[in-house]
Every structure is written in C-alpha cells, then in structure tokens.
Amino acid sequence: MVLKELRQKRPLVHNITNYVAAQFVANGLLALGASPLMSDAIDEMQDLAKISDALAINIGTINERAILCAKEAIKHYKALNKPIVLDPVGCSASALRHDTSLELLKSGGISALRGNAAELGSLVGISCESKGLDSQDANTPVEIIKRVAQKYFVIAVMTGKTDYVSDGKKVLSITGGSEYLALITGAGCLHTAACASFLGLKKDPLDSMAQLCALYKQASFNAQKKALENNGSNGSFLFYFLDALSLPIKLENSLIKEVL
C-alpha cells in the first residue's frame, strides 16, 4: 500500500499554504508519515526545490507576495520535474483568485489540482453552487472533473461528500468519510498537502490520489466514531482525526469505484 511506503520514505513536502491552516497542515503531514516544510520566502525557493520531494500551493490567504512566491516556486520545481499540487481556494468567489489560479495553471508544471465542485467547475466555465450543480451543459461532478483533467493536463481531485479523481480518461469515485470534515478549518488544505506527499513517491498518480482520498475518508470516519463515543464534537474530532491519520488505516467505510 502507498501509505506504508510513505511512512518508510517520509517524503519532504514544501508547503506554500494559508496562515489559517499552516499548523494543522504541518501536524497532519507528520501524522500521516510525511515531513512538512513550511516556507513562503521567495529568495529560498530555488534551494528548497532541490531538497523537497513535492510542492503544495494553497491560495487561501491570497496576497501579492504569496502570488509571487508561488510563481517563483513553480518555476524551480518545474525545472526539476517535481510534483506540484495546486489548491485554488475560493477561485469561484473572486476575480483575483480565479485569475491567479488560471495564471498558475497556465505556467505549466502543475501535476494535480485539488478543490471542491464550485472551484473546479469555475476553472472550466461550469457554474456549480454549494447545494448542487446549476449548469445546463454538465449535470454531474464526473463531467466537471474530467474536463478539468483534460484541459489542464493534471490529475484532478474533487473533494466533497463523494470524492472524484480523474486523469482525463478514467474517473474514480470515493465514498465514505465524515460530515465533521466540513466543520473544521484546514481539512481541505491538509488534503492538498497529503496529495503532494503521495505524488512525491512517484507511483501511479491516479491510483495514488484515489488511495489517498479513501484513506482520508476512512481516517475521518474513524475519528468521528471515536469522538461520538466520547460525547465529543468538532473540537475532539479534530484531535482524533490527527490520531487516526497516524494509525494503521484499514479501508472499511471508504469505497473506490470506477465510474467512467
């Protein structure tokens, strides 16, 4: 299993992430078995690209400095042919986020793109509301994720109640998980960083992303079960989730299925 190899190799993941979730992302990567590196210092991007196994970019707390740093990092990781995962946080909400996401994608070098249905849909011109799709030309997340993968030549990862991953040809769905993931800050940010850690192992990218989604959902299910057993809620779930990521994860609640 990919998780076993991850814990043996402990890939170094460079994160340019938002400051709201930075600590949670670092702790989550450590729990999973990877090694986090958190830096947005533009002048050290070239040096960090040489020693890191993968790069995760999250535009959650976007500003001019973060944009310049992301561009500089992509340039050096691309030159070394190392995996880059982009999380276009909120790109369906503002022109700045949308345009920045497109600019980073068009610079080349992005290996995987992780977001929710609204974010990914906006990158291929499909309007998708949080309560469901309202587009006339695509009526399922399957169509959105396939288009994203094809248009930007990436592994597309859509997370939500059901996760979907695609390489532009095949589409896999991953069910299971916990509703509590939507009630804590940073769950998506950590998922993006975890994607980078798995891609850093240089295994089959589509299979790796599907396995990660399944493991992530199973860990959240395990954490919810533990929290409820102890009369807990959001707060205890967060801590049990980190615990669950660090323990052996047996897929019982999560199911990977080929849908296209």
Swiss-Prot record:
Pathway field of the UniProt record reads: Cofactor biosynthesis; thiamine diphosphate biosynthesis; 4-methyl-5-(2-phosphoethyl)-thiazole from 5-(2-hydroxyethyl)-4-methylthiazole: step 1/1
Q: Name one Pfam family in it.
A: HK
Per the UniProt record, which EC number(s) apply here?
2.7.1.50
InterPro entries in UniProt: Hyethyz_kinase (IPR000417), Ribokinase-like (IPR029056)
A GO biological process of this protein is: thiamine diphosphate biosynthetic process
Q: Keywords of this protein's UniProt record, alphabetized?
A: ATP-binding, Kinase, Magnesium, Metal-binding, Nucleotide-binding, Thiamine biosynthesis, Transferase
Residues bound to substrate = 38, 186
Annotated ATP binding sites: 114, 159
TM ranges: none
List the Gene3D superfamilies. Answer: 3.40.1190.20
Q: Which GO terms describe its molecular function?
A: ATP binding; hydroxyethylthiazole kinase activity; magnesium ion binding
The UniProt catalytic activity note for this protein reads: 5-(2-hydroxyethyl)-4-methylthiazole + ATP = 4-methyl-5-(2-phosphooxyethyl)-thiazole + ADP + H(+)
Q: What cofactor does this one take?
A: Mg(2+)
Q: Which cysteines are joined by disulfide bonds?
A: none
Q: Which NCBIfam families match?
A: PRK09355.1, thiM
Entry similarity comment = Belongs to the Thz kinase family.
Known function: Catalyzes the phosphorylation of the hydroxyl group of 4-methyl-5-beta-hydroxyethylthiazole (THZ).
What's this protein's name?
Hydroxyethylthiazole kinase
